[in-house]
């Protein structure tokens, strides 16, 4: 069965939200004892941003959650917050992954969040992580910083390289042994993989939202570290 999703059902869906929508679908499948149910997202559901449309194509290829074919039924819900819905459903979404794991470290820094800007990392966090994973115990690992940017942009960190291709960056997640990310879609993807990185590290502000924590983190899947953002302009003297 294919269920049509009208615009406005889940708001404007971005990358992490799309995984949240899949989690809602898993709840509907479980409730109806039917693992074949799919969603057809009508135009206007997904953000028009190119990277959001591209991520939808990735999810179409990797999962059976979504159908490009229109269904015969329509979900009557409106204004459902997919993150709050987790209080009803729990964490159910699983993204199949059969890519071979490699000795690879991927860091997905977050510096340009356009909303909920507390998600943006302090500037010293990335150099700290680079130093941590440049230790001798990681000498045999490929080290990649996945980010937006030009393909020719040089990486200033010795032994590391930049990857700026959006699709390739998501492939790196599927093959990495170690993943580091913030409160954004790449982390939700990494944590939702049925065979993801062995070491999942999530960095977020201690003032961040609980309901957008990566899937399964609260059950002990992966680790979270919080950083301090000085909202009050603290003075020490």
Model-derived features with residue positions:
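Donor-binding and catalytic core of enzymes assembling or modifying cell-surface/extracellular glycoconjugates
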Residues: 4-22, 123-220
């Amino acid at each position: 069965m294919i269920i049509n999703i009208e615009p406005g059902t889940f708001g404007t869906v971005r990358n992490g939200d799309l995984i949240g929508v899949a989690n809602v679908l898993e709840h509907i499948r479980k409730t109806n004892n039917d693992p074949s149910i799919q969603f057809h997202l009508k135009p206007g559901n997904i953000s028009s941003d190119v990277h959001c449309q591209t991520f939808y194509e990735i999810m179409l290829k990797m999962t059976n959650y979504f159908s490009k074919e229109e269904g015969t039924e329509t979900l009557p819900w409106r204004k459902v917050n997919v993150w709050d819905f987790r209080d009803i459903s729990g964490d159910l979404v699983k993204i199949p992954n059969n890519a071979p794991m490699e000795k690879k470290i991927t860091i997905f820094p977050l510096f340009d969040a356009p909303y909920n800007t507390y998600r943006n990392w302090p500037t010293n966090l990335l150099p700290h992580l680079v130093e941590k994973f440049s230790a001798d115990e990681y000498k045999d690992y490929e080290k990649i910083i996945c980010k937006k940017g030009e393909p020719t942009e040089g990486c200033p960190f010795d032994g590391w390289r930049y990857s700026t291709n959006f699709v390739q960056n998501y492939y790196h997640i599927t093959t990495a042994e170690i993943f580091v990310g913030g409160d954004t879609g790449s982390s939700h993807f990494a944590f939702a993989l049925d065979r993801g990185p062995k070491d999942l590290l999530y960095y977020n502000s201690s003032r961040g939202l609980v309901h957008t924590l990566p899937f399964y983190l609260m059950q002990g899947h992966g680790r979270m570290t919080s950083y301090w953002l000085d909202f009050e302009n603290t003075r020490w003297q």
